């Protein structure tokens, strides 16, 4: 498939004098003067924008399929997310028993090792539990929380630590330093979240090797003028990528704008943190074995606690421009390149030879037109 006459986002700019060839799920060639191969389909994009596929580093579920359900659900998530323009994602776990966690990590490994065509790539697990603070549990179940230890991590993963790409943890817990250092040594990205840490403890965790903050502002100590908490460190420490849920529900618009001004187009990471109702109508659903009610784009436990989102990555991208005042160039990076960089995923989040499909197509004013590839 040869793509012509579009505005392709390459190297942080939109380029119009470019042709891009897609084949077998990847970009296979790029040049200004590419001629079609014999029998090759040629698509005239008529000036539409073409962006890299999205990378979602924090997503629990989609359209009724939940990571914690296992392999079949994760594969179906991958197929359906591809159609929404997602090139890669991290199936994200909830706090659960050791046996259930081990089962899900094994399922994620099987999907990683046997990817399907026309399905988003699973790049590993985002373990959002169990090394969390009971004070900031959010929708995670406290009865499964543990203090961090490498031995517990080996048990939870069945020894397959490389199936885990990111682990969220509270850095103020006992033995956190030893765990963070060991995880970083083994190429696992430590994300600070569900934590009652102080500003100083977050900076210290970055010194130990933490590189990310999980859904900044949510389920963590708040920012105040004398105790800036987790957000204070997240927004000022250049070593840290900062996830955020830009759905207009989890965060006040100005809180997102502050994050974007502080982290810029280099370190802000859009996520969905979506649960199984994403892409489905309002109603009664579940997250981590807990009942969730979805009404008007809000997913809440029965006690009113927010329980993930119903956000799509393409909506997160559009919100960055329409709601939070970002340029198209910045919005693209925050939804593609930055998430990929924050988890060390080469070959994703950019348009280049070897990059994975799908690409996404957008019309005037960035109206969604679907996927390419």
Which functions belong to the PLM regions below?
Residues 1-37, 371-372:
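N-terminal metal-binding scaffold of metallo-dependent hydrolase/deaminase domains
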Residues 133-161:
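Conserved phosphate-binding/catalytic loop of the ribokinase/pfkB sugar-kinase fold
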Residues 60, 75-104, 120-133, 160-172, ...:
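Divalent metal-dependent hydrolysis catalytic cores, especially in the metallo-beta-lactamase
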Residues 266-288, 293-310, 353-354:
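Short acidic/histidine-rich active-site segments
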Residues 154, 158-280:
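Active-site core of metal-dependent hydrolases
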Residues 8-19, 266-267, 324-332, 341-373:
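Acidic, glycine-enriched loop/beta-strand segments at the rims
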Residues 47, 58, 81, 127, ...:
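Conserved, mostly hydrophobic/aromatic
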